[in-house]
Amino acid sequence: MVKAVVVTAPDATPEVREINLPPLGHTDVRVRIASAGVCHSDLSMINGTLAPQFPLVPGHEASGVVAEVGQAVTGFAGGDRVVLNWAAACRECWFCVQGEPWLCTAVEGVTSVEGGTLADGTAVNVRLMKSRTLGYEAFTGKSSS
């Protein structure tokens, strides 16, 4: 079990709860979430505008460290720092080839991972992690000296 912020109904007060994690599949990567952002689409899900499935764990944009990989996973290992993308880019369209997978025209969008969660320790199918073009630096501005 892990702790997660859970919203149980539209406009309900978020609560910290312990939730069960599904078993790790052979093509999954389990990530220990270091941080997750709550963006406008999360707020729209929380207030019911986007009609998500409740209960919901908001925060579908996250970064963390790979904790465990499934047997069929290659290219990732425990300890790898990763940024989780909210959608699986095709890596073949014009935008993906240009290094802009967030604009993918064939994207398989997800509000988050299965069950609407990105709780700490959630297993993410490796297809959602194939685009490693974004590092931590893509989410931070350069500090002035």
List the predicted regions and their residue ranges.
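Sterically constrained small-residue positions within well-ordered secondary structures
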Residues: 7-10, 22-24, 57, 138
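Short N-terminal binding/cap micro-motifs at the start of the first secondary-structure element
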Residues: 11-16, 40-41
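Short structural boundary motif marking the start of a folded domain
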Residues: 1-5
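Glycine-rich beta-strand-centered segment in the early N-terminal region that forms part
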Residues: 22-36, 46-97, 102, 110-112
